[in-house]
Structures are given as structure tokens and as C-alpha cells.
């Protein structure tokens, strides 16, 4: 690659990312007063916790250790499929019934993250799904992970591959 070609490529990237920044000047300019509250008492969590023995799997200890145990229990038992069409309702109860220990019924990262987040919530660990979107006109892929909030530490992202 010549120096001229290299400069042209980097100028194009600069134009793209300058446009992205221009169109998102107000992103994140809130007043910082947003409060997120979790309701761990919903009946669906009780049903999920009991059917899948989530308290037993999570065990005792820190929220980090408990979330990690849930992740290590679920990840190898849920087959990943990028081609999954999201036809099952997006909740842990229905998704686990469809895909747990069933490699023929793979699900994508969006739904694996939903399962882990709801299983964490069912045992009282604050968690949510986070979508990671590339902001490039050349990259149309994305990824979804579970963010577990640990009061004593910063948020931790758990990714089930």
C-alpha cells in the first residue's frame, strides 16, 4: 500500500467517525439523576428459581461468585446459533424450555444474555442485557452480553459463548 492510499483510507475513516460524532452531540447529556430499580419479587422469578434450582446452582458467597456459577452452569448447556430467528418469547422461562440441553435448538447471544440476566435477577443479583453495537457503516454485526451490577465493585460484563 502506498502512502497516498494509506492517507486516503484514513481520511475516509476520519470523515465517517466525524459524522458519527456530529450526529450524536447530545448523547449522554442527561442530568445524571436516572435511578434504576429492580423488583426481585415478581412471580416469574419465583417460578424460574424453583424449576431450575437457581439458588442451589448459584450457591452462597459474593454476588460475583454466584453470578459466575450461574454463567458456568448455563453457558455449556445452551447452544449458540447466529441463525436463530427469535420466534420463542424473549424470557428465560420460555427460552430455557426451548433450548436448555437441546443442541438442535440453538439461540443467539441476545437470548442467552436474557436467560443469564433473568436467572441472576431471580436469585437477587442486579443484572441487565447490554447491546454492543459497532458504529460503522461497514459493520452490521452486534453482540449482546449480560451486565451484572456488583455493589462493591464496578459493573461486570458476563458473556456466554
Each language-model region and where it sits:
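Secondary-structure boundary elements
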Residues: 4-108
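Long, hydrophobic/aromatic-enriched structural stretches that serve as scaffold segments
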Residues: 73, 77-80, 111-119, 123
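Hydrophobic/aromatic-rich core segments of domains that either
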Residues: 114-161
Amino acid at each position: 500500500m502506498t502512502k497516498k492510499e494509506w492517507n486516503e483510507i484514513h481520511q475516509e475513516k476520519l470523515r465517517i467517525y466525524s459524522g458519527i460524532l456530529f450526529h450524536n452531540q447530545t448523547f449522554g447529556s442527561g442530568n445524571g439523576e436516572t435511578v434504576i430499580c429492580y423488583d426481585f419479587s415478581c412471580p416469574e422469578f419465583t417460578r424460574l428459581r424453583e424449576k431450575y434450582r437457581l439458588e442451589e446452582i448459584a450457591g452462597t458467597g459474593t454476588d460475583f461468585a454466584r453470578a459466575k456459577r450461574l454463567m458456568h452452569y448455563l453457558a455449556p448447556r445452551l447452544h449458540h446459533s447466529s441463525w436463530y430467528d427469535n420466534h420463542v418469547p424473549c424470557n428465560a422461562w420460555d427460552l430455557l424450555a426451548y433450548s436448555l440441553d437441546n443442541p438442535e435448538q440453538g439461540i443467539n447471544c441476545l437470548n442467552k444474555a436474557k436467560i443469564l440476566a433473568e436467572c441472576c435477577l431471580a436469585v437477587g443479583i442486579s443484572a441487565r442485557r447490554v447491546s454492543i453495537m459497532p458504529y460503522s457503516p461497514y459493520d452490521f454485526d452486534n453482540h449482546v452480553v449480560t451486565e451484572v451490577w456488583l455493589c462493591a465493585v464496578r459493573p461486570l460484563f458476563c458473556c456466554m459463548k
